[in-house]
Amino acid sequence: MEALVYTFLLXSTLGIIFFAIFFREPPKVPDRGGK
């Protein structure tokens, strides 16, 4: 059970940090620009 809790907390933290950085810095790749 401890492993599950630690994994969940780690994923949540990484997700929050990723979204924070993503929203702070707008993506340079256009959404509908293809490659």
UniProtKB/Swiss-Prot annotation:
Transmembrane helix is among the record's keywords: yes
Keyword line: Chloroplast, Membrane, Photosynthesis, Photosystem II, Plastid, Thylakoid, Transmembrane, Transmembrane helix
InterPro entries (UniProt xref): PSII_PsbT, PSII_PsbT_sf
Q: Report TM segments.
A: 3-23
Compartment(s) of residence: Plastid, Chloroplast thylakoid membrane
What is the recorded membrane topology of this protein? Answer: Single-pass membrane protein
An annotated GO cellular component of this protein is: chloroplast thylakoid membrane
* Origin: domain of life: Eukaryota
Residues spanning the signal sequence: none
| Protein's UniProt keywords contain Signal | no
Summary of the function given for this chain in its UniProt record: Found at the monomer-monomer interface of the photosystem II (PS II) dimer, plays a role in assembly and dimerization of PSII. PSII is a light-driven water plastoquinone oxidoreductase, using light energy to abstract electrons from H(2)O, generating a proton gradient subsequently used for ATP formation.
What family does the entry list?
Belongs to the PsbT family.
HAMAP family annotated for this entry? PSII_PsbT
Query: How is this protein named in the record?
Result: Photosystem II reaction center protein T
Specify the taxonomic lineage. Eukaryota, Viridiplantae, Streptophyta, Embryophyta, Tracheophyta
